[in-house]
């Protein structure tokens, strides 16, 4: 025994520890008991609230289901906590925990499956209504869902119109007054189709089916700014054309138009559009710029100089050898940028900024700084002109960046007595026609500019201010300046004809709805067709109508894959982020394509899924029939012959199809742009009686045909995808900026729309040396041919 150590001290320590443990266990058991009691009370409360819904005769709204699931999350968290301390539970409590876990699982399953189970019971209760009508399971569920906000994602050929029409009829069957229902379509033909279906299939002859145009007009009439006439989206491009014609004799306008046509030839790209910085630099390093004279030059500065000389009728040679210069081991044969043979003058355009630095992409991982190396080359070249007494005009890349290149060049040319002979206004416009042979391409951009400005609530004053204040590219500035002049004429024509345009009308209607909601008609049920096409102001108008009538419901049908009208102001995020606008919304996917053969569905699925901006879904074909997608390719390298080749092949194919098809079958010819359609249509003056239609892809949306020809699936400025429609020129009238990918994704959606018009045989036209990107993307589904087949394959 150790001297001085008492046994009482360790005993006291052990006793204290045991006492603390006993207290902690008691407190834990108390907490566990209270937690179990709380869980039981919560489950009992849930069961009480849900008791009236277990027979599925009453509908439990999404908000209440979400609240119930949040409460269950808390229950599961508590049960998880209790489960960690099973050893401290009494037998009775363990049995309660097991029972509560089962009850919580059951409640969660009930809430998660409620909509589906309710819908199936409602379908069963509505047998008399549905009868033998051919609806699939997803269509039936969409028709009977009773949520306040509903979105039906209806893929191409999935029975969208049939489902929407049935929803209107079903709502009436449930007791709604027809006048309390508002069904909205975007086109008159879609409105008429819905009316006819309601009357013929359901005996509803007085349905309130309208276009957005007629609804907006009715409400906008209450605005003091309203005028008698309203120009729709078909009339607006014609008014833009008239606006341009009024300015045709204006030399400044002609030069502005030419300036933009020249800028359209430039690809303004950003680094984020490339997989790596090196790929971005490679693009800048090796891209060529085409001039008005057809020559290819190495930079936009050289392009602008070449175009200026051409437009002022100054003869020049590009990179002509300076045979008089010294030969230097460090340099090849010296070839200055431009030589003016009539004057013996050379022009060098130096690729440096004000600090003497070259662009970053000049670097190729060399040990020598590229700016230093370039500077040495400049010194040697300048010395050659001094030594051999040759005249040299010098320009710089920073002048191009600062928009002073042409004024500086003009001044130096005049000082050297170079005669500048400017083109006449008509000659300038001829050059514009040469650069943009397809007028509908430019009209589409112009229409988009005005439409997007008004959709975003911008006036000409606002756009002018943005132009002064923002950091815009040269192309954006040139186009905005041009469009302000056209917009002024556009508004003058509207005023002269006592008209407003469609965007004005919607904006006026929205102002009325926000300030005088008491004057609005009350609708208990609002249904919208082609929801993917809705603009922000139209959506705000719908929200105002919903707010004007307590308890009103919204039912929308659309397809994010068919959002192709951004030029008219539609915003794809209105369908992608539907629940952000309408909380607790229900979503149903109609994923069966009843229109297209199996391989067309597979090809369209593949290309749609290449887009990043989309709803994830996989469309399945109802048909198991495999029909080849015929690809006609022009052979040879001479692309100037493509239009004539395509015209003859398409004419031959259409003639054969018309002769061999059944009387009730249709042929449809589609193109990204109208020009090849107009030429081909002249060959078939009786096309309507022949069951033949010629449509741009935009106009073809919502239609179908047994045989579809898609023209001009080629690359290039006027190809598909359109490389000339640089939507970044519209950034100045938008609230967000395009990043380049948005343009390609919409073009890809347009290709998807074209493919899915076809019920039987699909024919694509391309060039073997100028294939469209979309042809490359879908090539595994295509059957290449060199000559059209002359037999019609039965559906």
Where are these regions (language model features)?
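P-loop NTPase Walker
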Residues: 27-227, 756-757
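Conserved P-loop NTPase-based nucleic-acid remodeling module centered on helicase motor cores
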Residues: 54-57, 180, 185-260, 374, ...
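Conserved helicase NTPase motor core
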Residues: 83, 101-156, 162-164, 182, ...
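Helicase P-loop NTPase motor core
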Residues: 158-164, 273-278, 288, 584-586, ...
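Conserved helicase C-terminal RecA-like lobe
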Residues: 663-664, 687-691, 695, 700-788
